[in-house]
């Protein structure tokens, strides 16, 4: 199934049912009082997180959704039936944004979590409601109100504990295949991975974490080069970044330059995301002669001036992957324990995630506006007014 991580939809809640104008009329009761019932409330629209879904593709084919209207009231003080609520399933990890106000309405991060996005209309009142001591036969009713309507943008960000960074062909997909049951496509050409892939890494019984592999970045990605930066938003929810680098690139390029290029693109996308804990993973060490391996890897670390954790692995053979995933598991457990025991730390972490979300949204929106402006400029060039005044000269036969 095609992976779609953004969709725009229009939701409209149901209208409230109108109140009823009615009077009691029975045998031997020629002048009964008012008995018009209220209308029913209109149905509301909800979004519900569903773990069985992993894409927003269904919302690309149908964009308009409307809840049921409330039924009008009836005589004998019968209240109209309430309109049925409309519940739209979305993948876990979906952010809902009001396109008109740019307000973030909510984040659906847990299975079964619901978010009301359009309030149903209020019911109208029947004439019974307007009876008083001075008005025994009211002919006044009220109409049900309109349901709320909204233009929404749905943004899916995958939920993962660990995110993989690196240039195309750095071995990210091979690594996730090596440590989990995920089976992303692997080939010897750039941009084999076109959509994010998730894998569950089981370290031992009841100890596991989720890892996300996104399409590779290249220099200039923040300006739209390669696959651009649209997939970087999927790293916003991660706790830890693993930066994979090929220690023996086939084109002879510098591994240190590759690391710096990705770090630069990350900073341009989100400074908060760039400040996330990031570990350096030197991959494909089996491509370097064993006697030169230590010196070669250390030279890369020295050139970068890297002060964080460094791991040397071969994703293809599995060499060094077990110590890496064990270290990641320990780090994640320590972070979770610290968040549980320290409310201040938990609040700082939540604030950091909100900043990353906002920075990512602003960057992606700016990128979207730039692409739209470029397309409009191209269209204008195709319709130059001077084209209609071209002089046609016929060559003599």
Swiss-Prot record:
Localization per record: Cytoplasm
Keyword Protein biosynthesis belongs to the record: no
One Gene Ontology cellular component annotation held by this UniProt entry: cytoplasm
Would the keyword Nucleotide-binding turn up in this protein's UniProt record? yes
Q: Which intervals hold domain OBG-type G?
A: 160-333
PANTHER family, sorted = DEVELOPMENTALLY REGULATED GTP-BINDING PROTEIN-RELATED, MITOCHONDRIAL RIBOSOME-ASSOCIATED GTPASE 2
Task: State the name under which the record lists this protein.
Answer: GTPase Obg
Supply the source organism for this entry. Answer: Marinobacter nauticus (strain ATCC 700491 / DSM 11845 / VT8)
In the UniProt record, the gene name given for this protein reads obg
